[in-house]
Design a protein with these regions (language model features):
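Secreted, periplasmic, or luminal enzymes acting at the cell surface/secretory milieu
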Residues: 25-158, 164, 189, 218, ...
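A short helix->loop->beta-strand "cap" motif at the edges of active sites that frequently abuts
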Residues: 16-20, 38-39
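Intrinsically disordered, low-complexity Pro/Gly/Ser/Thr-rich segments with frequent PxxP/GP/PP motifs
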Residues: 171-209
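Short, contiguous acidic/charged loop-to-helix segments that flank catalytic cores in large enzymes
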Residues: 5, 45-47, 135-138, 181-188, ...
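Terminal connector regions
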Residues: 201-248
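Short acidic, flexible loop segments centered on an aromatic residue
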Residues: 154-171, 177-179
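Single conserved hydrophobic/aromatic residue that forms the stacking wall/gate
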Residues: 1-12
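Intrinsic-disorder/low-complexity, polar/charged segments enriched in Ser/Thr/Lys/Arg/Asp/Glu/Gln
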Residues: 142-144, 192-196, 233
């Protein structure tokens, strides 16, 4: 079966130990059909000569893990966007467009094994009190986002606080949300700190080919504070207003009223 084909069958057959921790040494995501049968997974990737000592320190509690996944681990290989064109005809096709990585899985509303940005710690963190410096911003404005992070566990730890932006205007085809910034903080047990993000126009923009520049459409945007791309802790809304006028592109379906609207 799948478990045996991936080298873990003997562990379950022999019932060596119910409390099994799997340490992954890999360069990219792998299928993990055995995930629900183990107590924990430590993803160390390809760390180099100090991997063994660092792994032991984490497993025995001398160090507290704080890393986050820089990629999505899918449920199975066939869930990946590249699967549809593999192995290809001596060339690779990248058909995802702007829906690369977690953006693809979000758009497809697809369940994943572990989401982009995921990573556990031996302590826990509480997110609270999100505050925006304004409810509306323009192209030249800076939006300040404050959020309070509290270490609610019993040991010191580090958390990577992630900020995603979701364009709710519907003006262009865009991902459900996009990572725009992240900040790593260290907290002692019971300690709390305010994390501050500063967002400019680029945080709300996409590249508009007709304009030949980054363009932030008029409309509402969700500011999402998260522990991972699938673990949104806090959300606030802001309105963006732009004075930039896009070039008018006429087609055979353009009506006279659209010409008049653009001229005005």
């Amino acid at each position: 079966d799948d478990v045996e084909s991936r080298g873990l069958g003997d562990v379950y057959k022999r019932q060596v130990q119910e409390n099994v921790i799997v340490v992954l040494h890999n360069g990219s995501p792998v299928e993990m059909p055995w995930n629900d049968k183990v107590s924990a997974v430590l993803e160390v990737y390809l760390c180099g000569e100090a991997t063994g000592e660092a792994t032991a320190d984490i497993l025995f509690g001398k160090a507290n893990p704080c890393g986050k996944l820089a990629e999505t681990i899918p449920m199975k290989l066939s869930d990946t966007p590249s699967y549809l064109t593999f192995p290809g005809d001596r060339h690779a096709e990248y058909n995802e467009g702007v829906f690369v990585g977690y953006r693809y899985y979000d758009k497809k509303e697809m369940a994943v094994r572990y989401p982009f940005g995921h990573g556990l710690s031996y302590t826990t963190f509480e997110y609270s009190d999100i505050k925006l410096s304004d409810t509306a911003v323009g192209d030249d404005d800076i939006l300040t986002v404050n959020v309070v992070i509290t270490n609610t566990g019993n040991c010191a730890g580090k958390e990577i606080v992630q900020l995603y932006v979701a364009d709710k205007s519907g003006f262009a085809v865009r991902p459900e949300k996009e990572l725009k910034d992240f900040i790593k903080i260290e907290l002692q047990p019971g300690e709390r700190k305010t994390v501050t993000f500063r967002l400019d126009k680029r945080a709300f923009s996409y590249y508009n080919e007709e304009l030949g520049d980054w363009y932030a459409p008029n409309g509402k945007y969700d500011i999402m504070i998260a522990s991972s791309s699938r673990d949104i802790r806090l959300t606030a809304e802001v309105t963006h207003k732009t004075a930039v006028k896009l070039p008018f592109v006429a087609t055979e379906n353009t009506v006279f009223g659209e010409f008049m609207d653009y001229a005005c």
